[in-house]
Amino acid sequence: MGAVSRDDYIALCTELVEHDRCYYVLNQPTISDYSYDVKMRELQEIEVQHPEWKVSWSPTMYLGDRPSGQFPVVPHSSPMLSIANVYSLQELEEFFSRTEKLLGYSPGYSLELKIDGIAVAIRYEKRLFAQALSRGNGVKGEDITANVSTIRSLPMRLPQEAPEDLEVRGEVFLSYEAFEELNACQREQGKLEFANPRNAAGGTLKLLSSKEAAKRKLDLSVYGLITDQKKRSHFENLQLCSQWGFFVAGMPKQCRSRQEVVERIREIEEMRAALPMAIDGVVIKVDNIAHQDRLGLTSKHYRWAIAYKYAPERAETILEDIVVQVGKTGILTPVAELAPVFLSGSRVSRASLYNQDEIEKKDIRIGDSVYVEKGGEVIPKIVGINLAKRSLESEPWKMPSLCPVCHEPVVKEKVSVRCINPLCSGGMLEKICFFASKSALNIDHLGEKVVTKLFEVGLISSCSDIFALTEEDLKQVPGFKDRSIQNLLASIAGAKKVALDRLLTALSIPFVGSSGAIALADHFVTLDKVIEASLDELMSIEGIGPKVAASIVAFFSKHENREEIRRMQELGVQVLSKQSDKEAPLQGKVFVLTGTLQQMTRTQAEERIRSLGGKVSSSVSKSTYAVIAGSEAGGKLKKAQDLGLSIWNESELLRILDAKSVS
């Protein structure tokens, strides 16, 4: 690691915070586990060398997996920590040596599959399924009982030989077969496909409808047992779990020596491709429970366990073409078109090439036989070339000098190539898709396929055009039926009230992601103040460096960008300013939504409640301030009535939200 400045340190913290959010909250990883671990180790080294730089929000202070706010947070019975990773046999040997030194002798080990899923804790009371929690921050987790209860392999009642009260911990996952079925359904409905089974499992656990979750065929593999009746070994605990009706994947094995562990690691790696679910390694645990207790834990990891991570799965296929896409900020990105190949449980036909420099560095050419890997990335990447199969007639690939969409000259930047034509339809289409996406305004029923169709028929050519759409416009579009038209218009109407940080994210300001948008909203409070902010004001915000500040100033200095915002406001868009505690009339009040809302989506209702300081829970309790009952409200409404809670209809909620007062 070379010399670093405090700005470099802040930038690395900011980057890792965003990766954490994408991985743990959105379940949309942006880098591979290995790359993340390398960056995290670099951050830890910097903080050791410069402790005076350390900020309170550093990713090294947390385990990740922040609560989404959609589910109540509940304390764990005991810490639910992550397991440290190793990527080589040498690192594994260091774990063995460290463990044996602490114990004073060589213990036995148990070894099990490391399923690539979502960790959960499941409690049983009087042998009946009672509650399920996500890992959360390791101390508290979100209550995901409703969605976990849809898992068919999870026993709702335990046999008499099981303890009355116990907790199991396990991994929720989707089999390859269930994952393919789910993505087929997504395609049929015109929705985006999930990148991998883990993303799909994580997204399913965060669904607000357990009925929808039940359709997705989640599965659960148990890897731990907590009970007052402690057994001698972890392996015995897993055997008991299996006897009580839990699924325990992958034939856990007791190993008496280091060599047995290594042999088992190699055996599983050989059979990995034939497994019905995705795994990314194996977990090695000290088998004796008393030994585990002696070894204890750190603030983040168990000392008695380690995860040996396999290299990402790799396949060889033909690079048939390289196509260039124009992104939402005008950056040209080359994408490899591949002969379809099956990899990590899904069919792969495209791979990321990043930029011209990356292509030149690897000397990637059309027609090459290439090696493709799929880690946690949205699309796979090319990691090597089989030069023995390269044609003598192949030629190096060059980035076009003209934009492939608008055919205007492009500009070469330090790393990227950018189309600077503000009217380029390619960049604008990507910008509109992002504007409506879950990561930005989250407009239901306005996915990528719908945006593309509306763009192609000329109904929208800018983000503000979305808010000008009418029923008459949509009736002209082939395939649009009355119900889908009404659903889309209702979603658009609901999106007209938008939190400041959401809008700043949606505008696609170069170098400003969601964390930067939140920082801007927290500091400036109103959109007007952000627009008029000077370079010095922007650079005074922690995490906003010179490059980002200059980009923000440049963005808002352009007439077309200010005009776009003005038009949105003319079409009814209201930017909800960040509320201080004193200005938050719903501060500390807990709401529960049930049934179907007519004038806005549930997500939009939740965001508006939160913008005024309120909280949204998925379950009714005595601490609930009010239950918002839409049409077809179910059991939550009945429970609220039984508890004598306040029950509001949608109109009452809108009145409170619009008045910004509960009086």
Curated annotation (Swiss-Prot):
It is an enzyme of class 6 (ligase). It catalyses: NAD(+) + (deoxyribonucleotide)n-3'-hydroxyl + 5'-phospho-(deoxyribonucleotide)m = (deoxyribonucleotide)n+m + AMP + beta-nicotinamide D-nucleotide. One of its GO terms (biological process) is DNA repair. NCBIfam families: dnlj (TIGR00575), PRK07956.1 (NF005932). Zn(2+) binds at C403, C406, C419, C424. It comes from Chlamydia trachomatis serovar A (strain ATCC VR-571B / DSM 19440 / HAR-13). Belongs to the NAD-dependent DNA ligase family. LigA subfamily. Keywords: DNA damage, DNA repair, DNA replication, Ligase, Magnesium, Manganese, Metal-binding, NAD, Zinc. This is DNA ligase. The active site is at K114 (n6-amp-lysine intermediate). NAD(+) binds at D33, Y34, S35, Y36, D37, S82, I83, E112, R135, E171, K285, K309. Residues 581-663 form the BRCT domain. GO terms for molecular function: DNA binding; DNA ligase (NAD+) activity; metal ion binding.
